[in-house]
Amino acid sequence: MNLRRCVQALLLLWLCLSAVCGGPLLQTSDGKEMEEGTIRYLVQPRGPRSGPGPWQGGRRKFRRQRPRLSHKGPMPF
């Protein structure tokens, strides 16, 4: 039981010291402070889909639909 309390006390002391000193979580890769560090985005935000694309004026409004299988006539077998 004494060993358990000793381990808990050491863990609590380590957590308090790492919270006070900052630890490696508050450092940036370039060595600057958090306010001066560069912000890197992993995912690029997408633009609006209604903007101009490969065709002038955005999407093609009247696109011919694909015919269904029933429109192709009888099956050959």
From Swiss-Prot:
Residues spanning the signal sequence: 1-22
Subcellular location(s) per record: Secreted; Secreted, Extracellular space
GO molecular function: apelin receptor binding; hormone activity
Chain residues in the propeptide: 23-41
GO annotation (BP), single: negative regulation of vascular associated smooth muscle cell proliferation
Compositionally biased region (Basic residues): 58-71
Modifications made to the protein after synthesis: At least 5 active peptides may be produced by proteolytic processing of the peptide precursor.
Keyword Aminoacyl-tRNA synthetase assigned: no
KW Ribosomal protein (keyword) present: no
InterPro entries: Apelin
Disordered: region residues: 43-77
Chain coiled-coil ranges: none
GO cellular component: extracellular region; extracellular space
Record family assignment: Belongs to the apelin family.
Function text: Peptide hormone that functions as endogenous ligand for the G-protein-coupled apelin receptor (APLNR/APJ), that plays a role in cadiovascular homeostasis. Functions as a balanced agonist activating both G(i) protein pathway and beta-arrestin pathway of APLNR. Downstream G proteins activation, apelin can inhibit cAMP production and activate key intracellular effectors such as ERKs. On the other hand, APLNR activation induces beta-arrestin recruitment to the membrane leading to desensitization and internalization of the receptor.
Name this polypeptide is given: Apelin
